[in-house]
Amino acid sequence: EATGSAELKGTKTLTGNRTLDPEQFSFKLTTDPEGENLVKDSTGKDMIVTSDADGKFEFPTLNYNQDDVKDVEDISKGKDFIYYVSEIKVPDDPTYTYSDKVYKVVINVKDAGGKLTVEEPVITDNATGEKATLQFENHYKAKGSLNLTAAKKLNVHSDAVKLTANQFSFVLFGDGIKKQVKWNDAKGTVTFDQITYTEDDIDKDFTYTMTEQYGKLSGFEYSNEVYTIKVHVSDMRDGNLKVDAKVTNLEGEKVPLENMQFDLFFNA
């Protein structure tokens, strides 16, 4: 009995500053564009495959024999076998943006006098009808953040001088952020706007500088302290970014992130 076969291969690309893992994404071959009626392989298993670390995937060989085309009315035209390829999405997964692509695959099979001829698959985008290859693109989404605070400490041994809200101002500036100017609250706490990071920042380094702005309040000796915050962003591979921040003061000494302090003296 004459037989023939066809191969279906595709690729997966992942954007978002992230590499692919083996068997990370799955694809299915169906007989309907909705992806409900799965094609079976020669062993009766559903044709569902996964991509490898290079983003390549391949369905089991599609085999045909003379029985598949015995009822063809026009032998010269043969018979078209129509399939659809789509990606299997993971429900409620905010980490990735999955592809909505559905590809139509047409494979023509002819019985030419006892010899089976299987044409190369003709692949089109099911939405547009344009010729295509089996290519799916996903985007990896990740986020992380850094919250920076400082303390203003008033070194005065007098009840006549007290720290009040919005009395002193502080500046934060550096890589990738707009210059921030913040004022202390009644307890001396200075809170800067949260700095956020995305997948575009993976494996990048950032440097920020925090200082006090000199004011004109009579009798006060403002701090000349300068804090340098160096940040490295790394991927946790689960949609979260690790933001590692290290702080040094003006003398180059290490300072805990939560211990940035500006001392203020009053000269009566």
List where the protein language model places each region.
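Solvent-exposed loop/turn and edge beta-strand elements of beta-rich ligand-binding domains
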Residues: 1-268
